[in-house]
Amino acid sequence: MKDKNFTGMPKELQPWEGFGREAQAVKIVVDKRRYGKFVTIIEGIDPKIEDIEKIAKELKKKVASGGTVKEGRIIELQGDHRQEVKKFLEDMGFKVSVEQ
């Protein structure tokens, strides 16, 4: 993906970095799939503002699990990782809700 830094300013000095994250309502749901396997589904991250592929990659590394991005806006992780994902996204500045 193309770098969004078009100003030439160092990334840490850009005032808009992370802007709007608290306004995004991210929802985490766990779904039970075939053979009793669980899948953690994260939706509500705006792909126009955030690099969803990068977030998915970081999440997969954080929870040591496989996963994918569906339809360019939904992150699916293998296994039940609700609490780890919630903490990770809240630390990034997102407003997160977990559904049981």
Swiss-Prot record:
Molecular function as annotated in GO: mRNA binding; translation initiation factor activity
Could you say which protein family the record assigns here?
A: Belongs to the SUI1 family.
Pfam families, A to Z:
SUI1
Protein's name in the database:
Protein translation factor SUI1 homolog
NCBIfam families found in the cross-reference section: PRK00939.1
Enumerate the PROSITE patterns for this protein. Answer: SUI1 (PS50296)
Q: What is the lineage of its organism?
A: Archaea, Methanobacteriati, Thermoplasmatota, Thermoplasmata, Thermoplasmatales
Q: Any S-S bridges, and between which cysteines?
A: none
UniProt cross-references to SUPFAM superfamilies, sorted A to Z:
eIF1-like (SSF55159)
**A single GO BP:** regulation of translation
State the Gene3D superfamilies in the record. SUI1-like domain
Q: Which domain of life is it from?
A: Archaea
Keywords for this entry? Protein biosynthesis, Translation regulation
Record InterPro entries: DENR/SUI1_TIF, SUI1, SUI1_arc, SUI1_arc_bac, SUI1_dom_sf
